[in-house]
């Protein structure tokens, strides 16, 4: 018999996370590595676990994640978004808790592009009066 699994896709900045929730003990595996090994910062590990805390499902599901693109923060945000979406498939009643915590909203903030004639997106070259 096929094992029950719930799938969610999360995005943040340039990162995309494909998340699989399987009933289990609460183990989180990201790109075939344990969460402690893959995410070096405790604060980002907490960000990833926010949807589980909001729905009080910590320890109920094993989470397998494939994530690519971006850096630590973008990937953590993408995984969080993916877990929240997968939890919606588990139980649609979670929507209220997840939405009030702001976990279902795709964070649309992106890096602003560099403009010609400037050193960065907004940083201008040094101005000399004389």
Swiss-Prot record:
Q: Its family?
A: Belongs to the universal ribosomal protein uS9 family.
Native species: Lysinibacillus sphaericus (strain C3-41)
The alphabetical list of record keywords is: Ribonucleoprotein, Ribosomal protein
Give the SUPFAM superfamilies listed for this entry: Ribosomal protein S5 domain 2-like (SSF54211)
Q: Where in the sequence is the signal peptide annotated?
A: none
Give the domain of life: Bacteria
* Composition bias type Basic residues, residue spans: 111-130
**What's in the GO CC field?**
cytosolic small ribosomal subunit
Region (Disordered) residue ranges read 105-130
Task: Identify the Gene3D superfamilies for this entry.
Answer: 3.30.230.10
What biological-process terms (Gene Ontology) are attached?
Answer: translation
Annotated GO molecular function terms are: RNA binding; structural constituent of ribosome
Q: Name one Pfam family in it.
A: Ribosomal_S9
Q: What is this protein called?
A: Small ribosomal subunit protein uS9
């Amino acid at each position: 018999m096929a094992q029950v699994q719930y799938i969610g896709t999360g995005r943040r900045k340039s990162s995309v996370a494909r998340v699989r929730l399987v009933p289990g003990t609460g183990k989180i595996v990201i790109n075939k590595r344990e969460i402690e090994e893959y995410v070096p910062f405790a604060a980002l590990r907490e960000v990833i676990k926010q949807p589980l805390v909001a729905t009080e499902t910590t320890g109920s599901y094993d989470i397998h994640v494939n994530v690519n693109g971006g850096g630590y923060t973008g990937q953590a945000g993408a995984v969080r978004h993916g877990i929240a979406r997968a939890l919606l498939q588990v139980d649609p009643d979670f929507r209220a808790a997840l939405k009030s915590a702001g976990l279902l909203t795709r964070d649309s903030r992106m890096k602003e592009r560099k403009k010609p004639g400037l050193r960065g997106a907004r940083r201008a070259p040094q101005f000399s009066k004389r």
